[in-house]
C-alpha cells in the first residue's frame, strides 16, 4: 500500500515538474513569437522608409543637360504633350524652387500660369495718357 502511495506521489511530482517545464517553454515560445512580430513590424517600417527615400532620391536626381529634376521634366513633358506652352520665366523660377514631387511642380506651374494670365489681362487706363 505504501509502495502504491509512493509511486502515486512520485508520478504526481513528475507530472507537476513536466507541466511546469511545458508552461515555461510555452511562455518562452510566446515571448519569441512576440519578438519576431516586433521585428517584422520594424522590417515593414524600414522598408517603407527606404521606398520613400528612394522616391525622394529619384525626384531629386538632376539631368545635367537641362539642369532639372526628373519630376520637373516629367511635368513639362505632360504640358508639351498637351500642346501647352510654358513661359521661360516660369520654368526658370520653377528650377530655382527645387520642388520635391510632380504634384508640387504641377501646382506651382498652374499657380504661375494663373498669375501671369491675370497680369497680362491688365489694361492701361485711358485717362493716364495725356
UniProtKB/Swiss-Prot annotation:
Compartmental location: Host cell membrane
Residues carrying the site annotation Involved in dimerization: 113, 116
Gene3D superfamilies: Phage phi29 replication organiser protein p16.7-like
InterPro entries recorded: Phage_DNA_replic_GP16.7, Phage_DNA_replic_GP16.7_sf
Renumbered residue ranges of the record's region DNA-binding: 70-130
GO biological process, one term: DNA replication
Matches recorded under SUPFAM superfamilies: Phage replication organizer domain (SSF140713)
Keyword match Aminoacyl-tRNA synthetase: no
Regions annotated as coiled coil: 17-56
TM spans (from-to): 1-20
Residue pairs linked by disulfide bridges in the UniProt entry: none
Keyword entries, A-Z: Coiled coil, DNA replication, DNA-binding, Early protein, Host cell membrane, Host membrane, Membrane, Transmembrane, Transmembrane helix, Viral DNA replication
Listed GO CC annotations: host cell plasma membrane; membrane
Site, as annotated: Involved in oligomerization and DNA binding: 120
Molecular-function GO term, any one: DNA binding
Record carries keyword Phosphoprotein: no
Mode of membrane association: Single-pass membrane protein
Purpose of the protein: Binds to the long stretches of ssDNA of the viral DNA replication intermediates created during the protein-primed mechanism of replication of the viral genome and attaches the viral DNA to the membrane of the infected cells. Required for the redistribution of replicating viral DNA from the initial replication site to membrane-associated sites surrounding the nucleoid. Required for the second pull step of DNA ejection.
Subunit annotation: Homodimer; homooligomer. Interacts with DNA; one dsDNA binding subunit is constituted by three p16.7 dimers.
Family the entry assigns: Belongs to the phi29likevirus gp16.7 family.
Name this polypeptide is given: DNA replication protein 16.7
Lineage: Viruses, Duplodnaviria, Heunggongvirae, Uroviricota, Caudoviricetes
